[in-house]
Amino acid sequence: EIIELTGAPEGQNRIGVLSLPSFYADMEGGDRRCAKDVKKILERMNKENVDGLVIDLRSNGGGSLEEVRLMTGFFTGNGPVVQIKDTRGNVDIKSAHNRQKLFNGPIVVLINKLSASASEILAAALQDYGRAVIVGDDSTFGKGSVQQPVDIGQYLPFFAARDRAGLLKVTTQKFYRVAGGSTQLKGVESDIQLPTATAAFELGEDILDYAMPYDQITPCTNYKKDSSITAMLPALKEASAKRVEKDRDLQIAREDIAMMKQRIKDNKLSLNKKTREQENSTLEERRKSINKERKGRFAEMAKEDATKYKIYRLTLDDVNAKELPLADPDKDNEQFMHLAEDPTAELDDSPEYPSGLDPELREGINIVQDMLKLESSGK
């Protein structure tokens, strides 16, 4: 999507949103590749004079290392992307070979605890180069290792049932950032934290009993960090914190997180029927109260959005269009998301977020706006 802010000055008024559910690649040598598709989107964004960008990596579980290597270069230009150490201690540096950046504007990367593997490589590289502000959960998943499937059958006697022996996934390598730290256990830590739906749950490598430890190796020497974001961060954090305190949906998220953490900590449920019915009734009343309040508030937000934003759809089907169509979240979801009928869907009366912009995405857009303003003022 491209979001045009109708009240903002030129040079600060067009923000792109790039949603990446995975770093996909056609393993059979086909033409569908994440980096190739993203390049088309970014080229069209440049044509549309997009000033800043939100890259949404929430719940992106990873994918092709080659695709993330290529894609990182779109934002950093030529230079190292990730270091990979094998069991013998040999370090292989994977680099991008772009002569120049494809996108030069300020970037916010949205992450959560389910952003893992290749997502962490991209987020870490953009953070180490000083190209992006990382926003979301306190950190990503923390999967900094590489597994190789091994056919157990090849080690069995000749007359054994090899075809039914199965596969064993063996850890053979470990990822390291260009700055030297591993993404293992720690993941990529956010520059600005937001209360999110995944924050209440114990997710990540660090909760596993036998997870590999975090460690560091020698940083790459042939990369240069842009210090401008470091200088901006105090102002960005302060502005974001003020908005979060006033954002009703993010406050509801905070309340939900606190309630869920307490339930997990208590680790018990009453077996008394009346007690359980009362607990369920209390939760249901809270849900209904929140939804009722949201319906009225979302209607007002939708009216405000209509005067504040123009949202243009930008998919692979639109990259060569003469003019980009205006986005219609309901219609676009019907067209592009062909889902099996969900018999329980009608039981959920939670209203949809106005303009298809959830609270974290809205705050990501706000932070990009702040970055553009600070750049413009020279601070």
What are these language model-derived features?
Residues R99-K101, P157-A160, D215-N222:
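A general structural signal for short secondary-structure boundary/capping elements
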Residues A118, G130, V135-L203:
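Polar, glycine-rich mid-to-C-terminal structural blocks
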Residues E1-L156, K174, Y353, L357-L361, ...:
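Cleft-lining beta-strand/loop regions that shape enzyme active-site pockets
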